[in-house]
Amino acid sequence: MFDVANNTKLQSIIAKIYESGGVVGVGGHGSASIVNVKLSDGEYLVKGKKIACFPNSTETSKPWAKQGTLLPFLIESQLNKNGAKAQNKETLPDKSEVVVDKRIVSTMFLPSAALVAKEMINLVK
């Protein structure tokens, strides 16, 4: 999260994959890697899409996150700022649920990463 959100090389690779018809998948705090990706038309990749992420309420209330002060930004806030429809345990029926929107597959619950991979495989078949 600290080094991927503003990594321009990574953003370029992700944008090229998506714009070439590829599938992008993220889990846990991994949604930070796509939050600032811009497509060739200048729009954010996440704009208008449902993306699973940790809720601000978790980040700001948990001691392991130092009540949000340890993090460079709150993923839910940044996703919403960039036009996404952030999804999390407060909006999903199950925190381990996988969200698929267009060709972006996401989960807020890192142990669901295998389910993200399965959905990605289904999308490329």
What residue ranges belong to the model's regions?
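Active-site-adjacent pocket-lining segments in enzyme domains
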Residues: M1-G25, H29-K125
